[in-house]
From Swiss-Prot:
HAMAP family in the record: Dala_Dala_lig (MF_00047)
Phylogenetic classification of the source organism: Bacteria, Pseudomonadati, Campylobacterota, Epsilonproteobacteria, Campylobacterales
Cofactor dependency: Mg(2+); Mn(2+)
UniProt: ATP binding residues: 159-211
Keywords: ATP-binding, Cell shape, Cell wall biogenesis/degradation, Cytoplasm, Ligase, Magnesium, Manganese, Metal-binding, Nucleotide-binding, Peptidoglycan synthesis
Source species of the chain: Campylobacter jejuni subsp. jejuni serotype O:23/36 (strain 81-176)
Protein name (record): D-alanine--D-alanine ligase
Pfam families membership: Dala_Dala_lig_C, Dala_Dala_lig_N
UniProt function note: Cell wall formation.
Associated pathway: Cell wall biogenesis; peptidoglycan biosynthesis
Catalytic activity: 2 D-alanine + ATP = D-alanyl-D-alanine + ADP + phosphate + H(+)
Amino acid sequence: MKFAILFGGNSYEHEISIVSAVVLKKVINQNLEFIFCDEERRFYHIPSEKMNSKTFSTKAYKKEKELFIKQGGFFSKGFLKENKLECECVINLIHGRDGEDGKIAALFEFYSIKFIGPRLEASVLSFNKELTKLYAKSVGVKTLDYTMVRKGQNSKEKLSFPCIIKPARLGSSIGISIVKDEKDLEYAKDVGFEFDNDLVVEEFKNNIKEYNLAGCMINDEFVFSIIEEPKKKEFLDFEQKYLSFSGHNELIEANLSEELKEKLKDSFKKIYNPLFKGALIRCDFFILDNEIYLNEINPNPGSLANYLFKDFSTTLNALADQISLEKMIKISYNFLHSINGQKGKL
C-alpha cells in the first residue's frame, strides 16, 4: 500500500504535526509521499529527502510543487496536463484544528479520497471536550465531573480547588492550567480564553493514574497496542505529550492486573465502535479507586502512536486495506425529465 502523509494545517499544533510526520517517515518502511498544508491552507508536495525541520522553518517548502485537491485525489499542474499524486491512501496526520475538527474529513469524503483518520462525526465529538464527555456517557464510559466556564458569562457555580482548566476545543495540552487556589483562577481563565471561548474545569486529583491505549478495528476485530503508563509531572505537558513518540526507547507495558487491562480495552471498544471506524486512535484513561474514566480521545495521535505497537506497519496496512469509499449516488434526473415532458414546464 502506498501512503501519502498529510501534515501541517492552520493549527496551534502545526509544528508538532511536522515533527510527527518526520518521525513517521522513519517508522514506516515503505514508499511514502508527503503533503504539507501550510498556515494559508495551501498544499505542497514535499520530497522525502527534504522532510526535515529546516525545510519548513525557512519556508523552503514554497519552492516545491503546489498541489490542489479535486475528485479522486491531489494533483499538480503540468505543462500540458494535470498530474495526479500517486497514492492509495492518505494518512491524516494534522493535529488539532483542521485535522481533528472535521474539516479534512469532510474534504476527503466530498472528493472521494481514501484516508486513515476520524470521519466527520467522530472528529466533531472528539475535538470538543464537552461533547466528548457527553458521548462517553452515552456509551457507558465514565468521565470526571466537570463544569463549563464560557467567555462573557458569569459562572454561578462554585469551583473547588485544586482544579484543572482546559480549553474545550484544543487537541493538545496547550492552554491547560492547574489552579491551586482562587487567587490564581482569573489568570488561568485568561490563559484558557486565549485559545477558546469555552473552558472545561475538572477537580484535580493527586492520586489518579493515567494510562494510554491505542487501537483500531480491522475486519470487525479490534487490534490493540500495549497499555502505556506515561511518565509525567502534575499533568502531561506539551513536550512530554509530543516529543516522546519517536519510539527510540523500548516501552514497557503498564503493570496492571488482567482485570484492569480488560476494563480499559472494554472502555476503548465502547468509545471506538462504530464511530471511529477507519481511524487509528489513542484513548487516554484515568484509573481512580479501580474505576476507569476517559480523559480524552486522540483521533490523530502523535505519529499515530506507532511506538505503542509491536508491528505498526502491518497494522497500518491492514487498516488501510479494509477502508472503502462512500458509494456515490447515481442521479437519473427522471423526475425533472417527467416535469419537462408535461404541459406547464418548470
